[in-house]
């Protein structure tokens, strides 16, 4: 097996691949990819599939590159810059950031979906990235400093992002290892809905029960909804009761979040709040976030 490492740049993730598109192309390519008329009604001649593929190719090159001494992927984030294989410098194995590992996998999943008519390329992504990623992520998570066994992580949102990605892989490939990982994470995640002082919502961290953040409530609600849909679709023994549980979980979190961490008149999503000692929600930090 080849040696790989995941080394994710915070900027690259926050810009959702925009910078990666530019680094994927030399100056001669940019004019061919980005065309359009900015006056009047915007019409674009961009081939977005081509642009996405170029971005994904660059992403895989820089963030899933070989790392000496590693026999699997290693989820390890280097916050300030990506690896630069062409320089001959070794890939970074330092840093930590579990929240971005699910996003790393999502980029590969999106490429897998785009190429539904190219089974050879899909097989390449599945065999060379998806399959080795999961056990390596499990190993990294256990030793990252704030994780543990069975995909447990002190940050609920880290587990939620990864669980959402695992669910996507399972739905696309039927990989039972990903389903098992998904359910292990869900068993941890559901504890975030701790009803601390009877207030509701989902905590941000396991050791901060009064914490309430959009990044834990938004994806937590979404995960419960997707588990509801999956349970209904598969209709396994006893599915009705389990589906009802997921649906009720999602509704309760949604109702709480829209009441306390959103301005539904504008669509603004607040960052966080804390539950006060008297059991009332504190004032939210109204810095806008895009977690839902």
Please name every model-derived segment:
Residues 287-292:
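Conserved small/polar residues in nucleotide/adenosyl-binding loops
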């Amino acid at each position: 097996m080849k040696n790989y490492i995941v080394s994710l740049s915070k900027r690259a993730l926050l810009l959702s691949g925009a910078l990666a598109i530019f680094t994927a192309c030399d100056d001669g390519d940019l004019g061919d990819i980005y065309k359009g008329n900015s006056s009047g009604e915007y019409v674009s001649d961009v081939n977005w599939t081509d642009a996405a593929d170029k971005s994904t190719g660059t992403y895989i090159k820089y963030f899933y590159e070989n790392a000496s001494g590693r026999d699997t992927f290693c989820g390890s984030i280097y916050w300030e810059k990506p690896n630069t294989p062409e320089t001959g410098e070794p890939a970074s194995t330092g840093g930590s950031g579990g929240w971005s590992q699910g996003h790393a996998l999502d980029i590969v999943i999106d490429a897998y979906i785009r190429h539904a008519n190219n089974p050879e390329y899909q097989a390449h992504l599945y065999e060379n990235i998806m399959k080795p990623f999961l056990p390596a992520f499990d190993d990294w998570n256990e030793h990252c400093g704030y994780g543990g066994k069975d995909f447990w992580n002190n940050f609920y949102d880290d587990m939620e992002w990864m669980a959402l990605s695992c669910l996507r892989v399972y739905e696309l490939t039927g990989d039972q290892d990903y389903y098992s990982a998904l359910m292990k994470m869900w068993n941890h995640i559901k504890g975030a809905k701790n009803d601390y002082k009877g207030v509701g919502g989902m905590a941000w961290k396991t050791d901060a029960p009064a914490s309430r953040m959009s990044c834990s409530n938004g994806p937590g609600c979404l995960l419960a909804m997707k588990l509801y849909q999956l349970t209904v679709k598969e209709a396994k023994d006893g599915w009705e009761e389990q589906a009802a549980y997921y649906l009720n979980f999602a509704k309760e979190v949604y109702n709480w979040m829209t009441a306390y961490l959103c301005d539904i008149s504008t669509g603004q999503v607040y960052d966080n709040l804390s539950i006060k000692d008297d059991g009332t929600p504190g004032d939210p930090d109204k810095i806008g976030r895009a977690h839902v």
